[in-house]
C-alpha cells in the first residue's frame, strides 16, 4: 500500500481527482511540462500518445508516421486501431474484433468492393485496403478496411448507403468496409480500459466544466502504468 501511495502517477491522479492545482514537475516517473516543449523524441518515446479530439488525433498520427519514414499509403507494420465492434469477424483464436482493439497492419493491398447498382448511392463500389490485422491475442485475416478512413480520416460510406446495405446483408454479404484509423495517437475516450508502460498525454481544454475536465484528465494519466509525460 505504501509503495502505491508513493507512486508519482497515483499522486498526480489523486490531485486531479480532487481538483487540486497541477504544478509543472520533473519527477522520475512523471513529468508535467508546457505543451510548447513537445519534441519528436517524446512522440517516439511513448508506447501510446493520448489526445482529446479527432482533429489532434489525425494531426499527430500524420506527424508520427512521417517521423517513422512512412509514406502516404498504409504500410505493413503500421499501428492501427479498430473503431467499431465486428462480432462476426473472429481471429484465428476465435476472439471477435471489437472497438478499441489496437494492433499491426499486415500485408496491405489496395482493393475494391462492388455492391448492387439498385442501391441509391453516388458510386457502386468502395475502395478498400485488404489486409490482415495482427493483435496480441491473435490475427484477423483478409479484412477489407475503409481506405478513406486511413487516408483522409473520413468514412467512405454515409449512413444512408450503410442502412441500405445493412438491410441486404443476408443477401449480398457484409460489403461495408471496416473502420480503422492509425493508432499512434488515439483519443482518451478510445483508451478507456487500456494501459501502457509509457504514455504521453497532450492535455486540451474543452468547453465543459471543471469536474468533467478533471475526469477526462484522470482517465488519461491513469492509462500509464510506469512512466507518464503530461503536456499542458
Where are these regions (language model features)?
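Conserved coupling/interface region of RecA-like P-loop/ASCE motor cores
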Residues: 1-37
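Core RecA-like ATPase module of SF1/SF2 helicases and allied nucleic-acid translocases
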Residues: 4, 48-232
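Interdomain hinge/linker elements that couple catalytic modules in large macromolecular machines
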Residues: 21, 29-44, 49-58
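Short, solvent-exposed polar/charged micro-motifs at secondary-structure junctions
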Residues: 6-11, 36-42, 91-92, 115-116
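Alpha-helix boundary recognition
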Residues: 14, 43-44, 221
Amino acid at each position: 500500500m505504501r509503495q502505491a501511495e508513493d507512486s508519482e502517477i497515483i499522486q498526480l491522479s489523486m490531485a486531479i481527482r480532487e481538483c487540486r492545482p497541477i504544478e509543472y514537475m520533473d519527477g522520475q516517473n512523471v513529468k508535467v511540462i508546457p505543451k510548447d516543449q513537445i519534441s519528436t523524441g517524446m512522440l517516439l518515446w511513448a508506447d501510446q500518445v493520448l489526445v482529446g479530439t479527432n482533429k489532434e488525433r489525425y494531426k499527430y498520427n500524420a506527424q508520427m508516421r512521417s517521423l517513422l519514414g512512412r509514406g502516404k499509403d498504409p504500410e505493413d507494420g503500421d499501428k492501427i486501431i479498430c473503431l467499431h465492434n465486428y462480432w462476426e469477424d473472429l481471429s484465428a483464436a476465435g476472439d471477435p474484433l471489437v472497438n478499441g482493439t489496437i494492433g499491426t497492419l499486415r500485408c496491405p493491398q489496395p482493393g475494391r468492393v462492388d455492391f448492387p447498382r439498385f442501391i441509391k448511392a453516388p458510386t457502386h463500389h468502395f475502395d478498400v485496403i485488404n489486409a490482415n490485422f495482427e493483435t496480441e491475442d491473435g490475427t484477423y485475416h483478409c479484412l477489407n478496411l475503409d481506405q478513406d478512413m486511413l487516408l483522409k480520416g473520413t468514412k467512405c460510406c454515409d449512413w444512408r448507403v450503410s442502412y441500405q446495405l445493412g438491410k441486404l446483408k443476408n443477401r449480398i454479404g457484409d460489403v461495408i468496409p471496416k473502420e480503422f484509423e492509425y493508432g499512434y495517437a488515439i483519443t482518451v475516450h478510445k483508451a478507456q480500459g487500456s494501459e501502457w508502460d509509457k504514455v504521453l498525454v497532450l492535455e486540451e481544454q474543452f468547453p465543459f466544466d471543471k469536474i468533467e475536465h478533471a475526469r477526462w484528465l484522470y482517465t488519461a494519466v491513469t492509462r500509464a502504468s510506469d512512466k507518464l509525460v503530461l503536456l499542458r
